[in-house]
Every structure is written in C-alpha cells, then in structure tokens.
UniProtKB/Swiss-Prot annotation:
Presence of Mg(2+) enhances the ssDNA binding ability of the enzyme. Its EC number is 2.1.1.72. It catalyses: a 2'-deoxyadenosine in DNA + S-adenosyl-L-methionine = an N(6)-methyl-2'-deoxyadenosine in DNA + S-adenosyl-L-homocysteine + H(+). It comes from the Viruses. Methyltransferase that methylates adenine residues in the ssDNA and dsDNA sequence 5'-AGACC-3'. Essential for genome packaging because methylation within the pac site makes the latter cleavable. May prevent degradation of viral DNA by the host restriction-modification antiviral defense system. Optimum pH is 8.0. This is DNA N-6-adenine-methyltransferase. Residues 4-469 form the SAM-dependent MTase C5-type domain.
Length: 754
C-alpha cells in the first residue's frame, strides 16, 4: 500500500511524527512559528520543510506550491480554550486559528479532487475546555468541518437564567455557555466528524492528560466514528473508580495507607495494625507541569482529580510508626523499631516505555513482572523535586533527550548539571554542554505537545481503516445482474443506455475501476458492478444531485417528494424553474428541484440556454413518476462511487492499468439531420470528438481498456477505425425527440480498445 503522507500544523516538537513514522506514515511538511520548537524540527527532521505561518498555507495548497497530504493533523493553541488562558475562545487570535484550519482543510480537499484523490483525513487535538467555551467555539468548529453555515449547538437552550444538560447559565455574563458531551459524531453535508476525550493515563504514560480529539473526513470509504469509538466489549481501558469510598477515606485521613477492596491477603480494605502510621506519607498537588505544592491536599480523594491538572506525587516523610497487638504481613521485627515503608507501583506492561522497578526485589503482588515493591525509608528529610526535562519527555512518550538540542545561545552549566549530562553523554565537553537547550523552553515545548501513545493509537486506526479499503479495492469479478433485474436510471435522460445494457455488457471487460467521463443518467455504473467508479459530467446540477443523494439521502428523497406533491401545476413548475435559475436554492433544495424539473418538463429533456438557464417547458404530466426505487438502487449499488464535475479530459488522464473507461459522449449528428449537441450549455463539435479519441488512445497505452458509443455517422466510423478501435454495431431506440417519427431504431456503433 502506498504510504500515507501528512501535513502538520502548529507542529510543536512533532508528537505526530514520533507516533506515526513507525506506522509507515511520512511527513509532507510542518508549520511552526515558535523559535524553540522550530529549532527542534530543524534538528530532528532536517529533510522536512517548515512552512511557518499556517494562515498562508491554503493559498500555497491551491497554487500547487506544496503537497496536499492524505492526513492533516493539528494541535491548535489550547490557551484560548483552557482555564489558564481564561478561555478567550474565538475572540482570542489563537482560538481564531481554529477556523483557519477549516479553510486549509477545504483547500486541501479541493486540490486533491483535481487529481481525483480521496479527501484528506483531519486529526485535531485540544483541551476539554473547548467543549464549554462560552462562545460555542467547538460548535463553530464542528459546523466549519461538517460544511454547515450556522454553528452546531449541543442541544436545546433553556430559558434565560436556567441551565440544563446542554447549557450552563453564566450569571456574570448573562448568557448560556454550552456543555458539549465528551464524545459524539456529526454527519454533515461536507464531512463526517467525530470527537472523543481520551486520557493519556490509559495509553501507557504516567500522567493524567485528558484531551479532545477530533477526526473528520469527506471520504466516502472512511467513517471517523470507527476510528475514535470502540465497542464497549473490546475496549482496552478498564473504567477507573471515581466514587469516593468511605473506608478508603477513613484510612488515608492521616496519610497514605491501603485502600480498595480485599483483593489479596496482603492488601485489605481494613487497615492491619502493622501498617498503621501517623502521617507517614505526604501528598503533593500539581500546580503546573512538573511543579508540586505541599498544601496537605490529598488529590486522590478530590472529585476534581479526574480533571487534567491534578497529577499527584507522593513521598515518605518522618512519620512516627507504632505497633499494636497482632501480626502484619510486611513487618520485619516488632515494636516501634520497624522501618517506614513507601509503596511504589509500576505498570505490568507498557508498550515502548516499560522499565524494571528494581533488581533483586521480591514482588509483593504479581507472579509476573514486579508491579509493586516496598522500599525502606533511610532519609528522614526527603523532599519533592521538580521533574527533569527528560522525565517530562517520558511522561509524554518522547524519546529521552528529544528536546535536548544544540542551540546558538550559551548558558551557564554548573558542576552537578554537567555531571548529570555526562552520565547520559559521556563524551560531552563542557563547551558542548553550555550550548545545549535550556530547561525552560524544553518544559514549555513538552507541555504544549501531545501524548505520543494516544497519537499512535489514532494513527494506527486511521492506517488500518485506509488499508482495509485498499485491500477491498483489489480487482474482483464484477457482479452483473441478469437483464430482468437491471435498475432504471433516476432521470429521464437523452441518450440513456438502459435499453442497450445487454449489448454493452457483452463487451465491457473486468477491471478494478470504471471511469465514465459522461455519466449522464447513470444506467451503466449502477448495473455494471465494479468495485470503484469515477464518474464525471459537465452538468454541475447532475453531479450535485448525485453527491447530495450520497450525503443526505433521506433529506433529499423527502424534500424531492414534497416538490412532486406541491408543484405539479404550470404555475408551480414555473415557480420552481424561476427559483432554480435565480440560484436561490442551497445544494439540497437545488438537487430536489433538479429532479423535479427533469421529471416534470417536456419529454424529460435537460437543456440550458446560453445564459446557463434551464429553459425546457412544462410537460403537463398528470402523475409524474417519482423514482424512489431507483434512488434506493443507487444507494445500494455495488462499489464506491466518486462524482466530479468538469471537462472529460481530467478523468481520462487519470486512467491507467486496471481501469475500464466507458464513454458515452454527445453523439455526432448523422448526415442531413439536425443533431442537438448543446444540452448543458457546452458545444460538442467534431473537433471535440477527435480530442476525446486522442485522450482515449493515450489511456489505452497506459493500460486502460476503452469502450465508446456514438452515432453511426461515417466520419465517426472513420475516426474510430483510423485510431485502432474495433467497431461493433449498437442497435438503440431513440427515447427523446421532439418529433415522434424519429423515435425509431438507430444504428449506432461501439468503439472498443481492449
């Protein structure tokens, strides 16, 4: 499978690359403006361009100056949505960058569509505070990604001054603030979007770090919900106990001892006499990343401990132990002479970050790896120290020393620091040590980054989802229905091929993908049974209908049926046609109106004048047929279909080995007849016929197989013969004509290049 490439915005020190490169993904470019993270990128990834200001990327993508990646990842500045940043939201320029991200994602999708590449997959990370930002920043972001014009809201708003499950009344501002759920998904007109809060502590790092992750895409073969969500029965995380236990609270009231249920004879919910102590362990609350305060606040029994900024450090102090009658499981000798004990717990297995607890230490609980050991306290004056930068790197899952890079700024290095560095880098000179990055920028960059294991999990699920689609797109035998079960077209369409499908399928070869440069009514791809379909037409209204039916089937079918019921009169028809030509409809209503006009106009003719206006008159049909069955067949058709609107050349130039091209262009008029070749406001003269044939022969040389239909005009037969086509007869009955006597059997031709 071709490796996935990704573009990283607000890259920081590139948690995405550390997580995704081992999965076979490749960075296309970075975008970071902060000096120190940019220096880390330049040092660790010198071969990847750092494009700097992300607000300028959309124009560069559209101009083709930079690659349009398969995946777009971004961790927007979280300060605008965090408590520490006072939640400036969209009023803060950092929060407004989130909307620039939507602009960039749209530009990437537009550029990729020009090359018939699938839309990008979007990955976004931020703090949980974004879910309750007073300006509904998250709802704006979701709407932008999904393609809606108005912000989404989490639910119905209550009356002023009241709160409910979805909104919180803020008495200071006199406004409601949203309360978005911790996970959810939205299927919008442009993209599918899913979000979920993930906590790094369940992915193998020793910190609580809850973050909102959003995955979105316009791909029809990938559902973001399947990337972020898991079935409850197969989740790897056991839900933590958050309910306060009375017995546990009583036990730890004067320090840390034992809590929990009776799991093992050596650990009881009721404290054994030998483990009683007077404040033998102190609890420290995390005030900032790597900094702790001894304020005698036991974070472990706080309800807010579930939140992000309450990591806990515990150490043994000089508490006085005592003994009472009875024997304990951890006592070495009697009376008050026993050593104070500190319990340290280690995870049984941590992918990529496992460390042994100690050597020659008897495990207290497990028969496998030592997961809990007890240490004797020798020093009565133990103090909590600040975490070192390398420990912070480990907390995020980075390799040791990831941010320890040479800089151009000299710093003072004392003897202790030099000894510490030389312990890791024995050959490091004092001058080299002085030029290494200072701790301050390292702490900031690490704290602003993402947890590697969480990003790896998301990247792995994206690559597996895409890989499954790739595996499923291998060439398989087509599933062609018998003629009696062929599905009719949704539209009445001039030159439709439903009546000649048996003749066409006799010559249509096997292949991985069907390409139709002139899809029209769609009878061929609907019944041909290919695994993939690339379908083009110059008629923008036709393509809009197909895309809308793919995206909003229920809404479109319901709305179109209402048009059929309400407007089947001369006045109603003209009112719809007038609104259609004035471009007052959105995509959904325009699609419904297009189907209505096609089924109610004279002879089902789709025709536009030079001004681009639909100009066919009312057909005066008593009960026009509503194609519900045909639309359902479209939705249930074999394979994945991608619709594009434009010149036929683009999709033909995309063809290669394994592709089958079926071409049904506007027919060349027969001699002494008046052929109409301008149904969509685009002329199709004989010069266009020659250009089309030239493109088809080029595609055949690249490995594509070609079928083309046309009239039996002598100049067409000559053109096809001279270009190497095998020409076969195609007998068709004309179904659309202003003159009834011309709706007879036509002797058309099939040009074949296999």
């Amino acid at each position: 499978m071709k490796e996935l490439c990704y573009g990283s915005v607000c890259s920081g020190i590139e948690a995405a690359s550390i997580a995704w490169e081992p999965l076979g993904m490749r960075p296309a470019w970075f975008a970071e403006i902060e000096p120190f993270p940019s220096a880390v990128l330049a040092h660790r990834w010198p071969h990847v361009a750092n494009l700097g200001d992300m607000t300028k990327l959309a124009k560069k993508v559209l101009a083709g100056e930079i690659e349009s990646p398969d995946v777009l990842v971004w961790g927007t500045p979280c300060q605008a949505f965090s408590i520490a940043g006072l939640r400036g939201g969209l009023d803060d320029e950092r929060g407004a960058l989130t909307l620039k991200y939507v602009e960039l994602a749209n530009a990437i999708d537009d550029k990729r569509s020009e090359s018939f590449l699938k839309p990008t997959v979007i990955v976004w990370e931020n703090v949980p505070g974004v879910l309750s930002s007073a300006d509904n920043a998250f709802g704006c972001f979701l709407a932008g990604l999904a393609g809606e014009d108005a912000p989404f809201e989490p639910g119905d708003r209550p009356e002023s001054g009241k709160s409910n499950a979805f909104w919180r009344w803020d008495g200071k501002t006199g406004c409601h603030a949203p309360k978005w759920p911790q996970c959810g998904c939205i299927y919008g007109p442009q993209r599918k979007v899913a979000w979920r809060i993930l906590d790094a502590q369940y992915f193998g790092v020793a910190q609580r770090r809850r973050r909102v992750f959003v995955v979105a895409s316009a791909r029809t073969d990938l559902d973001p919900a399947t990337v972020l969500f898991e079935f409850e029965g197969v989740r790897r995380n056991i839900a933590p106990r958050r309910k306060k236990k009375e017995i546990a609270s009583a036990i730890i009231a004067n320090g840390a001892a034992i809590s929990g249920e009776s799991l093992n004879p050596c650990l009881h919910a009721d404290m054994p006499p030998s483990m009683k102590s007077t404040k033998a362990v102190n609890a420290f609350r995390m005030a900032a990343f790597g900094e702790y305060i001894d304020d005698e606040t036991a974070s472990t029994v706080k309800a807010r401990d579930f939140k992000d900024a309450t990591d806990l450090a515990v150490f043994s102090s000089t508490g006085a132990g005592f003994w009472s009658e009875g024997h304990g499981t951890l006592r070495a000798r009697e009376q008050e002479s026993h050593e104070h004990l500190v319990t340290l717990a280690f995870p049984e297995r941590m992918s990529g970050t496992q460390h042994a607890a100690t050597k020659n230490t008897s495990p207290s609980l497990m028969a496998k790896n030592p997961t809990a050991v007890c240490y004797e306290v020798r020093n009565a004056e133990v103090a909590v120290r600040r975490l070192t930068p390398v420990e912070c790197e480990r907390l995020q899952g980075f390799p040791d020393g990831h941010t320890l890079i040479p800089t151009e700024k000299r710093k003072k290095v004392n003897s202790d620091e030099l000894a510490y560095l030389r312990n890791h880098y024995p050959d490091l000179s004092e001058e080299e040590a002085a030029m290494l990055a200072a701790d301050g920028p390292r702490y900031k960059a690490i704290g602003n980054s993402m947890a590697i294991p969480v990003m790896r999990w998301i990247g792995d699920r994206i690559t597996k989802a895409v890989c499954r689609q790739k595996e499923g797109s291998e060439t398989k035998e087509r599933k062609v229905k018998p003629a009696a079960e062929f599905e009719r077209s949704i539209f009445k369409w001039a030159g439709g091929k439903f009546g000649v499908l048996e003749q066409i399928f006799r010559y249509l070869p096997e292949g991985k993908r069907l390409i139709e440069p002139f899809v029209g009514g769609g009878a061929v791809f609907t019944n041909a049974g290919y695994q993939e379909n690339l379908l083009n037409d110059v008629n923008a209204d036709l393509i809009n209908f197909y895309k809308t039916l793919q995206r909003e089937a229920h809404s479109l079918i319901t709305l179109a049926h209402r048009f059929f019921q309400d407007y089947n009169t001369q006045e109603g028809y003209l009112a719809v046609r007038n609104a259609f030509n004035k471009q007052v409809y959105d995509d959904l209503h325009r699609a419904a109106a297009f189907l209505f006009l096609n089924r109610h106009c004279f002879n089902g003719l789709t025709r536009y004048n030079q001004a681009g206006e639909f100009n066919v008159g009312y057909g005066k049909y008593k009960t026009p047929y509503f194609p519900l069955q045909e639309m359902e067949a479209f939705l249930g058709a074999e394979g994945r279909s991608e619709f594009v609107c434009g010149d036929f050349a683009a999709v033909i130039e995309a063809a290669g080995e394994g592709d089958v091209i079926f071409c049904d262009p506007p027919y060349e008029p027969l001699p002494n007849t008046e052929g109409f070749t301008n149904y969509s406001g685009h002329d199709f003269k004989f010069e266009e016929q020659k250009r089309l044939v030239s493109l088809l022969t080029d595609a055949h040389r690249r490995g594509a197989k070609v079928l083309i239909t046309n009239s039996g005009a002598p100049n067409i037969r000559e053109l096809y013969h001279d270009s190497g086509f095998r020409v076969e007869p195609l007998f068709a009955r004309r179904s659309v004509s202003c003159k009834g006597d011309t709706r007879g059997v036509a002797h058309d031709v099939l040009g074949i290049l296999l």
